[in-house]
Every structure is written in C-alpha cells, then in structure tokens.
C-alpha cells in the first residue's frame, strides 16, 4: 500500500475528556464518506484522568496494518498537561502536524515539544467548548480542528 493512501492520527488525552470518543467519531465520519478506517483506543487503568492514547487510520484502500501507530501524520493533544509527561511528538512525521488544546500560541508551546520542528497548531478548545456548549468538552472543538 502506498503510504500516501493512508492518513494516520494519534490522539493523546485523559480519561473523561473524550479523546476516545472523538477518535471513534472521526472513524465513523470517514467510513460514512466511503473510506476504509480504523479507530481504537489504548489505555491502562480505567479511571477518569488517566492518560489515554487513541488511533485513527483513514485510507482509500483496505487497512492491512493492525497495530498502534508509531509514525503518525498528525497528533492531536486534548490535554496540554500531557506534553510534560508523555512524548507526544514521538515518531511524528516531519511533514505532519501536531494540534494542541492550549491557550498558548504555537511559538509559545514549541519549546515544550522536545525539538519537533514541524507544523504546530494550537486551539483553545476548553474556552470554545465552555462558550458554545456550556461545559468543558474539549474533544468537540479538537475533532473539528482535526477535520
């Protein structure tokens, strides 16, 4: 399979923030548009606040890879606090991008990204969800920013 036929996305969040739900919603939307998809979470202790990782593969052809994603095209960080305890840029392709839920600008957050030199996008998903939805559901604006 040509790697350009497949987009791989890795999500980082905490239990209860909706990263898994956003991942699965993206898979459903891509499937509904005729794509082949995978969407699955990986997490340890099932408790609110524990770090979780979720993965998407979206392709025009059948996805024959069945493993975690180690070299994603995109990384979505739903909880900025994870940047200091998880290597969110691990394996991220140089021509990819990272989307981070933060009040900081891309220039302000870049020093925390362990030397990553690719595209950095930031969005204050907590503020947006509080203003629009009335509660902190950061997964919703993060999903919109990803699409």
Predicted regions located by residue number:
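Active-site cofactor/cluster-binding pocket
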Residues: 1-147
């Amino acid at each position: 399979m040509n790697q350009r036929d497949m987009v791989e996305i890795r999500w980082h969040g905490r239990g209860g923030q909706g990263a898994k739900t956003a991942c699965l919603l993206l898979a459903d939307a891509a499937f509904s548009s005729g794509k082949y998809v995978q969407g699955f979470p990986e997490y340890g202790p099932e408790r609110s606040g524990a770090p979780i990782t979720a993965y998407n593969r979206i392709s025009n052809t059948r996805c024959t890879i069945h493993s975690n994603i180690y070299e994603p095209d995109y990384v979505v960080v739903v909880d900025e606090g994870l940047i200091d305890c998880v290597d969110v840029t691990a394996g991220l392709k140089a021509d990819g991008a990272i989307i981070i839920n933060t009040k900081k600008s891309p220039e302000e957050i870049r020093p925390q990204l362990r030397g990553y030199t690719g595209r950095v996008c930031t969005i204050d998903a907590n503020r947006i969800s509080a203003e629009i939805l009335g509660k902190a559901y950061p997964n919703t604006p993060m999903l919109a920013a990803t699409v």
